[in-house]
Amino acid sequence: MDLEVDIVKNKKIDVQKAIKMTYKENKRSSLVIYLILRFLVIICMILQILRGDLNNALLCLLSLILLFAPLFIQNKLEITLPNDLEIAIYLFIFSAEILGEIDNFFGIIPYWDIILHTINGFLATAVGFSLVDLLNKNSKNINLSPFYLCLVAFCFSMTIGVLWEFFEYSCDKFLNVDMQKDTVIQKISSVALNPDGENKAVVVDDIGKTIIYDTNGDVLQVIDNGYLDIGLNDTIEDLFVNFIGAIVFSCFAFLDLKHNRSNSFINRFVPTKANNKLIKSI
């Protein structure tokens, strides 16, 4: 038993050394990006604390944890993230949490949210693409069709997208934030407005203004130019662009697998097991 424990410990140490060697030889750029972004997030967190904005300070803390996640995952799961994928993950986290939420790029820059969700769909598909290999590391012979493998990766990406929308909805409901961005619309259709209680939608078009009253009849808010959709359009839009990102990667992956391309575009974004050659050489 002691011998088995020692073997496992030595294997973990070898994997850690292999990962460190990989960073020194092939992934210096991702390490530099990580250190720069971590420094910027720490500066941002200090500024938020000085301003008394604890919510943004906690968001910075969350960003630091997320930035560390790729390093932790590689060490824990004994895998190697491609340099391009790792850099993309770091930039995605910084763009979403710091630039998007704290610096309000979601409100200032048009389509910022759409761009990030599209990238998320692409990257999540890359991770899903590698899951079959990573979760079946004890199976030496796995012969799956390219279509099936791409389908699994696509479904994984869409599942991540749906879970993220669940997270946004929960934050909006319980923390009174607005992660599911609202949209002013001029047309609604609802069976709740049917005076006879029938299952027939009543269409209200050309809405010019919405006035919100409290229970005492006092005006709380006036919404000009329409009616607030409470995040539905944003949710569907996010899922749709996630779908597009997942489809794009799946198509590239299918073509590469079909034509047996070893040095392909998708390999720059697909995690693999820790390099056995490096481990043996240590």
Predicted regions and their residues:
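Membrane-interface helix-boundary motifs at transmembrane edges
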Residues: 73-84, 138-144
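Alpha-helical transmembrane segments that form the membrane-embedded catalytic/substrate-binding core
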Residues: 117-124, 152-202, 229-253
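Cytoplasmic-side transmembrane-helix entry/capping segments in multi-pass membrane proteins
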Residues: 61, 80-91, 113-118
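Aromatic-anchored segments of alpha-helical transmembrane domains
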Residues: 39-44, 91-101, 158-162
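Structural signature of hydrophobic alpha-helical transmembrane segments
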Residues: 51-64
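Short, highly charged, low-complexity non-transmembrane loops/tails of multi-pass membrane proteins
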Residues: 263-282
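N-terminal membrane topogenic signal
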Residues: 22-36
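Membrane-interface helix caps and helix-loop-helix hairpins in membrane proteins
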Residues: 49-54, 76-79, 102-112
